[in-house]
Amino acid sequence: MDCPSCKVSYDEEVFTDNLMVCPHCNCHLRIEPRQRITYLTDENSFQELYPNLKTCNPIEMEGYEEKISAAEEKASLNEAVITGSCKIKGRDALLALMSFHFMGGSMGSVVGEKISRLMLKGATERIPVIIYATSGGARMQEGLFSLMQMAKTSSAAAELDEKGVPLFIMLCDPTTGGVTASFAMLGDITAAEPGALIGFAGPRVIEGTIRQQLPEGFQRAEFQLEKGFVDCIVPRQEQRQFFARMIDAHSLGLKETPKKKKA
């Protein structure tokens, strides 16, 4: 198996044992939600939520059902996000993990619904929410129904904030478009994986628009950290411990009922 960055070859087991991170250049390869669940959560603690929600082709876009079927086969998922409850080093958390292999991680009505439900559950039950974001943006095959999810997920994130329940975001490669312009930038802590592409429009679109070559590293996680767009960069091997610390640091008083704000 070749690293897409440095092109050095290793047995696939080497990549798997290293959480799909290249031992030579530290390139973080794109991985699937169930792989993340294995290294991030306590053994057998993940319980999937809302597994049967599926899109119904709301605007009857021709060929959409075929694209969904092909994506299901490619990603072994029925949508571009998995949501569930879990424990991370004994701490309770609600977890959403997006898949770029399912139609580019595009956010349609079901992705927005599952993420919104998860955040509202976190607000009601006062459980921290962690979202692993990776997406090419809104799902154009669902038209305005897709764009509506930006407001919907942002509203759910605001509910978490109102209830004082922490929302943690991990930006993975790539995170762009409508996901970047909505819930992915609304966390109490916004972290990123090394080298992740993060922005609204991708670099090729920007270069084609302004007809100029962008500087090396533009929109990568390290660039965004330097500009204050993300709070920290967390290597994959450290993410389990990182989220355990974040939950501890931000969860004081979660068992208490928040006081109502005076009108």
From Swiss-Prot:
Listed GO cellular component terms?
acetyl-CoA carboxylase complex
The annotation note on the cofactor reads: Binds 1 zinc ion per subunit.
Zinc finger region(s), C4-type = 3-25
What sort of enzyme, by top EC class, is this? Answer: transferase
A Gene Ontology BP annotation from the UniProt entry:
fatty acid biosynthetic process
Q: In which pathway does it act?
A: Lipid metabolism; malonyl-CoA biosynthesis; malonyl-CoA from acetyl-CoA: step 1/1
Which Enzyme Commission numbers does its entry carry?
2.1.3.15
Task: Report the locations given in the UniProt record.
Answer: Cytoplasm
| Cofactor annotation | Zn(2+)
Write out the function statement from the record: Component of the acetyl coenzyme A carboxylase (ACC) complex. Biotin carboxylase (BC) catalyzes the carboxylation of biotin on its carrier protein (BCCP) and then the CO(2) group is transferred by the transcarboxylase to acetyl-CoA to form malonyl-CoA.
What this protein is called in its record is Acetyl-coenzyme A carboxylase carboxyl transferase subunit beta
Gene that produces this protein:
accD
